[in-house]
């Protein structure tokens, strides 16, 4: 794939819709530690960077794009972090709605779930150890 400084290098780049792009970017950078990479207009879009190569685009509301309605879950973003407990504390400090406290799972991850003020669901995950998928009932189909 060719490089383009205008587009994040990640293969999959989710675009999440928020009613106020600037307000959402301010909250996501403060609460979840994202870094604003590119701003497109004052209220149109922003690209946010997270970790090593991860990216998300925050877009504005238009006639064919709306944020989730209260109580409606259409997706969940999974973000890998170095220290899930520290990340959890930061998210709580900035008013994230905690849906699930940090929990260790048999597949080697420690995770917590949160919602931002606009209803988007986020899961943050720290790798504790490398675990063979067969150990917890998974089947490895490709070695990437």
Whereabouts are the PLM-identified features?
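Vicinal oxygen chelate
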Residues: 1-15, 25-115, 125-144
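Short, surface-exposed ligand-recognition loops at beta-strand->loop->(often short) alpha-helix junctions
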Residues: 16-20
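C-terminal catalytic core of tyrosine-transesterase DNA break-rejoin enzymes
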Residues: 118
């Amino acid at each position: 794939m060719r490089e383009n400084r205008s587009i994040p290098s990640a293969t999959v780049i989710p675009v999440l819709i928020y009613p106020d792009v600037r307000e959402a970017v301010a909250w996501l950078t403060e609460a979840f530690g994202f870094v604003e990479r590119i701003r497109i207009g004052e209220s149109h879009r922003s690209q946010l960077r997270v970790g090593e190569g991860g990216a998300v685009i925050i877009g504005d509301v238009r006639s064919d794009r709306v944020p989730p309605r209260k109580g409606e879950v259409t997706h969940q973003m999974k973000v890998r972090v170095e220290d899930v407990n520290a990340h959890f504390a930061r998210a709580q400090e900035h008013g994230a709605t905690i849906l699930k406290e940090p929990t260790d799972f048999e597949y080697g991850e420690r995770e917590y779930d949160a919602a931002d003020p606009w209803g988007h669901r986020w899961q943050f995950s720290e790798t504790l150890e490398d675990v063979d998928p067969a150990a917890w009932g998974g089947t490895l189909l490709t070695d990437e």
